Amino acid sequence: MSELCSVPRVSERFAQSNALDEDIARLKYVSGKREEALRRLGIRTVGDLLLHIPHRYLDFTRSWSIEMAPIGTVCTIVATVDRIVQKQPRPRMQVTEVSLVDETGVLQVAFFRQPWIAQQLKQGDRLAVMGKVEFAYGFKQMASPHFEKLEDGRAAGTILPVHYVSDGVSQAWMRRIVSGALEVVSNPFDPIPARLRVKRRLMSNARALRSIHFPSSMAERDIARARLAYEECLYLQLALRLRNDGGLVDVVPYAHTAGEHLAALKQALPFSLSDEQEAAFKDILHDMCDGGRVMNRLLLGDVGTGKTAVAACALAVAADSGTQSCVMAPTGVLARQYADKTGPLLSQAGMSWALLTGATPAAEREQIHAQLESGELDVLFGTHAVLSDDVAFKHLSLVVIDEQHRFGVGQRNALRAKGPGADLLVMTATPIPRTLALSVYGDLDTSIIRHRPVPGAGVTTRVLTESSRDLAYGAIREAYEKGQQAYVICPLVEPSDSADELEDVPGIARDDEGRVTVPVPLHDTATELDRLRLALPGLTVERLHGRMPAGEKDRVIDAFKRGEIDVLVSTTVIEVGVDVPNATVMVIENGERFGLAALHQLRGRVGRGSVSGTCLVMTHSKGNGGASAAQDRLQSLEKTSDGFTLAQMDLRLRHEGEILGYRQHGGVTLRFVDLDADEDLIEWAHLDAVELLRYACNLDSVATRPLRDAVATRYRHIFKEVSGG
């Protein structure tokens, strides 16, 4: 362990940690309105301020004269304001024209719908502008460029950071404040052991913080970002693993053994496990039979890849060992579906099972409780109802959680507490890139199933604009005439709903601050229900959404499964748990509002039987600007059916939280890590976290305690989950 960690001087560590925890009000230049503005940005301490990194930079080390600036490229030009003119070429269209001059020529700059710029600038001001250079009417021009007023003594030849700011703090003041904070912590203690810094060739913490805010070159900025990204990843990995291990202190892992139940179950399966399924089960079996450690495994599988069959094999191993297992699903529909599909296979393998949900009658519930306590039941399928205090197992040794991102850590731990030392298998059908899985689910070992064991009929996807709506309705009518069914998916429940109602929609589009962005119009289930009943006379159309009582939801889904409903208008509540092989058409309204991974999940609800499915994604994109980009993104759905490929595309375009659903990863925001580009760095952090905890359990040694303190400070909300706070 001495190679990994050296013991820091306590006085040095204490002084520097105190400096980072200092309130921003103690900093030079911070008082009154500036303090309020910083707090609005979530900046309360010196540490918060130093982690509030620039979102872009103005690189004046590569500035051009007006004459030499190449047309058609993005350039930085430093010049002087010569003239400011405001125009209004048409109603509600305001243009501020600024003429910039240097010794080589004139640059005409136009700012659209930004009238306040005329008040910010005056003749003689020295400006740096960065934008695409165009040529028209005899002059070089820029439209709405990024600009910086050079009023703080900085000249061309430097790199200026551009931070997110709030009213009351200008960019110039933010730079002064950050510079003052860096002086306060001029040599901050580095919690990452020196051995790791050398091994990974990392910049020191002090230099990285200075270089990320005030780099001497963009190359230096990149090296600083890499250091801070590694630190962020390592801290997150450690926080997740410490949280996970927090409830496992002093437990004795159970060593399972495979036997007759497993052999009988494999015989009962209607197909042989694919190579990928066998590999995943081999991982699980190795974990379950290892009496030296408790299993913590994530099973990732695209829609229809056969995760349930793999999980059923794990249930059989638990039964072979004379112990019990519990499968918890997020909805009653999904729990019942598990019981309906997996239960008969378990029965054929000689295993007993039961289903427990909130709708289970009292008498049946009491019988299940008694059978669990006596050990008569091998497997319990259920919802949150299994977390009830009166549910007790004789010997619970395996916990399986499906769509685990829909459960909180507390719920996961509450179920696991019913069987101290129980192995944990969590599953999700949301394709997640490996880098994201390592970062956000770093406390879990991962097995991946990418391909379907038995190729299905497949799904054809088309992106349609509003002008092609008749094609969508025609597809629904055609399916009905063939005796098939359809889904219509809307982002909202009621027409009166606002953006707030979209907060938990997986993959919903957001701005840089995480706020839902809403176009007009947004489709809702109530309006769409009425519209479809008018457009498709003779068809039975009903709706489904998450606000309905559980019993009503079950009634609608059961009716749809029985074929009594021809068209189901629904929110994304059907994304998980509705398996109707006769449903062959899906129409998704406002497709541009969803991430690719979420759309892929939705279309996985059709084409599940012997008949191929059709998914029609409706969009209001007009084909220009950002709308064109949205349409290009959607068209990638037409080209690939691989959920992991789509998830990787999503990762390049959207925040990590939008792939998982904004709150599903516990409020963790990755500031520095580029999940698309930092695969090696993320792998390093993962390996180093495992090694650190192997040598220093809980990081509670003298040498590693500073690192634990730093992790606890950065991810204090995760550590609260350890202590139940």
Model-derived features with residue positions:
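Long, highly charged, low-complexity intrinsically disordered interaction regions
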Residues: 1-28, 36, 236, 246
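Upstream accessory/linker segments immediately N-terminal to the RecA-like ATPase cores of bacterial MutS
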Residues: 34, 71, 87-268, 662
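OB-fold nucleic-acid-binding modules
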Residues: 52-82
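Short, surface-exposed secondary-structure boundary micro-motifs
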Residues: 80, 132-133, 239, 591, ...
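N-terminal pre-P-loop "Q-motif" helix
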Residues: 271-295, 309
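Inter-lobe coupling/hinge segments of SF2-like helicase ATPases
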Residues: 290-635
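Accessory helical-bundle/CTD segments and flexible terminal tails appended to RecA-like ATPase motors
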Residues: 558-581, 586-589, 604, 608, ...
